Amino acid sequence: MFAKRKPEPAKRRQHNLAQFGLTEIPDDFDPTSGYGDDDGGDSDLEAELAALASGGGQRPKAKPKPKLMPTSDLDKMIADSLRDVSDDDDDENLENDSDLLGELHGIGGLEEEPEAEEAAAEPAASEEEPVQTFLPTTTVDTLGIIKQRLEIYKQAEANAKASGDSGKARRFGRGLKTLQDLHKQAAAGKTINVDDIPPEVSVKPAGDPSPAADESPAPSTPVSQPTRVAPAPPTPTSPPAATPPPAPATPPNPLVAQMRSRQSEYKAAALQYKRSGDTANALQFLKVVKQFDVVVKMCEDGQEVDLSDMPPPPSEFLEFLAKMKGEAAPEVVTAPEPTPAPAPATPPAAAAAAESMLEALQRRLEKYKSVEAAAKAEENTGKARRFGRIVKQYEDAIKQYKAGKPVAYDELPVPPGFGPLPSTEPAPAATPSLPTSPTSPPATASTSAGGTPSGSSATTPTVPRKAAPSPPQPTELTTRVTGNHQKSNLAEQQMKLLLERQKEFKVAAIEAKKAGEIDQAKEYLKIYKGFDSLLNAASSGLPVDLSTLPVPPSQRDNLEASFAIVSAEECDPSDDICEIGVRMEEQLAKQLMMCKNTRDHHKAMGDVAGMNRFENLALTVQKDLDVVRYSKRKGQPLPKFHYEKRNFNIVHCNTDLTDNELEIVVARGINYNVPNPKEVDTYVRVEFPLLNDESFKTKTNVIKDTNSPDYDERFKVDIQRSNRQFQRIFKRHGVKLEIYSRGGFLRSDILIGTVNVKLQPLETKCDIHDTYDLMDGRKQVGGKLEVKVRVRNPILTKQIEHINEKWLVLDAEG
């Protein structure tokens, strides 16, 4: 009934244990087998077991006990560990510390075998072992380069501190600290990357005006550093120190040497003036010395420097300043040249400065074109477009200059390194300035031009240029201060004109005094003194009205010479003097009425400023009218007068209306085309559109027995100016007026014609006043209707009326 269960087949493992990191067990492993079959080696195992059980086995060697340190040495070590030792003192002798080097080599895997140590320890008792020297991992060349750079940076920092350049001194100090850290690491045997070593800088020996020869930098290819160091052989105790290869020296920069030489001359001159008590000249020379520092730094950084603008020697500098200021040359005291300073070398030929406005514009145009081309080469489209606009601006300026048209020089940007544009006429040269680089112009120092109306202005030394003889002017010591700021040519021209006019009156006063005309000389002197306030205003940048300047004496003489002097008998007396007086009185009365009406109009509008303006004008006209009436009454000659053209801007406003009122005036009808013109009775219906399809409707009274009636009726409509829907009504719709003729008994009224008045003109005007043809659809039926529509102010803008008046003005008596 029940079948016997079949044995299951042995399952095979799908995975082996090796892939899980375990030892593979074979499938036929039998734990009971394997030991009984092995007959060899049992006696050896039993003997070993017996030896272990009896304790007769060989005992392991006992480790030697460490020697106990004496108590005195232990106290000394504790005191040394508690003492605060600076890092600099700890790292001074790391290079020759054999213990540390040995530990370093031990860490690197260079420990000696124990057998070698034991073998070396045995003969140590009999004879002293020679000292081994462990070599650092840093090569001798790298260590020598670091030491060499340390000396260079120390000297450069000292020179920078001596010259007062704090920024350069701080920079050299940071490089010196980096070199000191690298030197400590190299002495400790650490690997140093050559790229981490600060670059070499050019220094000059102390006390020598010319810079020392620049030493060539270290080789750019880094020296391959060994990862492991071979054990040092027991050779001599003091190995010879390897010296770094001498770096080839580069020739000195002649520009820096020349500028240093000239700077030392100015320093000596400033010191000489300071000792002699001349502080002003000492400060002047000291400012030039400061400018030299900026340009020397630019030259040392590799920027291009032009020596054409280098100041002259100190002996010629003050003389050049005196020539520019218009002072006498004998007052200039030449500065003594310092004896230790060598004679400066002659400067190389420099590019000639622009002598005319056209050349200056061309040079600036070429500069901006080169910058634009560089930007295009770099694919910097934004910069290229920006400089392209500047190039176009300069090209237009050159075209205008060639065509003789005025050019707005103030709007032209000035590239870095370029001074202000030269004026059209020779102007006083600027104070000598140091050469500037096209990339970074040096900052200018400000000084004061004493004794001149122009006040203080910035001075920078420039190349001395010969100036044409001109009247004494305030010394212009201003040059370009920022990239887009330069002095206005208009201001310079005004300044020059004022000085020339002042000089003319001074000369005229002297000549009048010599001729014995004391009163005339006093008058000219007063005018001469009055120019001081104008000069101060012009030098401060304020505009000056040149039309108010007094006429120079030379032009006065020419003006008087152009008229023929006649006697009273040669002139025919005029018979219409009384008529002229009457016309003058009428004209002044008309002007007075106009001023009063306009004053009242502005008062009704609430314009207080306009009211005051016309009030004052009315007072002036009233005074003139009183003078004319008084002269007529007393029989005196009429005062001198002249006519002027005056422009008045009057805001038109219907002040009798409010802002939310519109007035419709039906004035009259003109020649209606009706069959019975003398018996017709007419009236007008008015319809004005409002919001929400509503409308204002009214009608006039009936005018009987005429076809040209005078209605003269006014209707006021309330409007909403601020409502946009109501504003659209003014734009699209109009006032509808229908003219009716009253019918007889049992007859309805007859429509004569229709008039539509558009309201759109009220957006910009206050009034609509016109006559309109009567229409039947699109056909004219004959006759017209006069209509006027008014609002207080236009819907959108103010209505300003420009009035040109021929104004009668009485001359003031001198």
UniProtKB/Swiss-Prot annotation:
- Positions of the UniProt region annotated as DM14 3: 358-416
UniProt entry keywords in alphabetical sequence: Cell membrane, Coiled coil, Cytoplasm, Endosome, Membrane
Q: Which residues form a coiled coil?
A: 351-378
- What CDD domains does the annotation carry? C2_Freud-1 (cd08690)
Cite the residue spans of the region called Disordered: 1-136, 157-263, 414-486
Q: Where is the C2 domain?
A: 633-772
> Record's PROSITE patterns?
C2
Q: What's the protein called, per UniProt?
A: Coiled-coil and C2 domain-containing protein 1-like
Could you tell me which Pfam families the record lists for this protein?
Answer: C2, CC2D1A-B_DM14
Protein's cellular compartments: Cytoplasm; Cytoplasm, Cytosol; Apicolateral cell membrane; Cytoplasm, Cell cortex
Q: Which organism is it from?
A: Drosophila pseudoobscura pseudoobscura
- SUPFAM superfamilies given in the database record: C2 domain (Calcium/lipid-binding domain, CaLB)
Highest taxon of the source? Eukaryota
Q: Where is the composition biased (Acidic residues)?
A: 25-47, 86-100, 110-130
